[in-house]
């Protein structure tokens, strides 16, 4: 089996995932997965595509991720891993699509407007 390369994005985070046959080692930016993502919810998000397709421990995954915050990075990795699982076996599509793991979340941060404090918040208004 050759190495499968897929890209996932979320907000401003970009994740590049390289999946190859192995013993289940997952490295993120040359660190172990548990060292990079310390909270349980983020670890669950990253492992979700592997759990749903029952491929935990079957593949070695090398991940390069940059940009955004820690949650955006975890969700970018989840999308890239989901795409890689579908590339490995088309039958995985049926398990991942209902969970919404193959859909790129289009929500981005709304820009700040001039004449306002933030994107939607206005400066204090004084009637008199």
Curated annotation (Swiss-Prot):
Pfam families the record matches: Ribosomal_S9
Classification via InterPro entries: Ribosomal_Su5_D2-typ_SF (IPR020568), Ribosomal_uS9 (IPR000754), Ribosomal_uS9_bac/plastid (IPR023035), Ribsml_uS5_D2-typ_fold_subgr (IPR014721)
Gene Ontology MF term list: RNA binding; structural constituent of ribosome
Protein name per UniProt: Small ribosomal subunit protein uS9
Gene3D superfamilies according to UniProt: 3.30.230.10
GO CC annotation: cytosolic small ribosomal subunit
One of the protein's GO biological processes: translation
Keyword Ribosomal protein in record: yes
Organism encoding this protein: Christiangramia forsetii (strain DSM 17595 / CGMCC 1.15422 / KT0803) (Gramella forsetii)
Keyword hit for Cytoplasm: no
Record family assignment: Belongs to the universal ribosomal protein uS9 family.
Residue runs in coiled coils: none
Keywords: Ribonucleoprotein, Ribosomal protein
């Amino acid at each position: 089996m050759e190495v499968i390369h897929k890209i996932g994005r979320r907000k401003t985070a970009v994740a590049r995932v390289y999946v190859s046959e192995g013993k289940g080692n997952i490295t993120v930016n040359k660190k172990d997965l548990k060292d990079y993502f310390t909270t349980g919810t983020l670890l669950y998000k990253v492992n979700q595509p592997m759990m749903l397709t029952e491929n935990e421990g079957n593949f070695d995954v090398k991940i390069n991720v940059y940009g955004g915050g820690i949650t955006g990075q975890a969700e970018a990795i989840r999308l890239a891993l989901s795409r890689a699982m579908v590339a490995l076996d088309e039958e995985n599509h049926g398990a991942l699509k209902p969970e919404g793991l193959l859909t790129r979340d289009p929500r981005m941060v709304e820009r700040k407007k001039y004449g306002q404090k933030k994107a939607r918040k206005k400066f204090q208004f004084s009637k008199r």
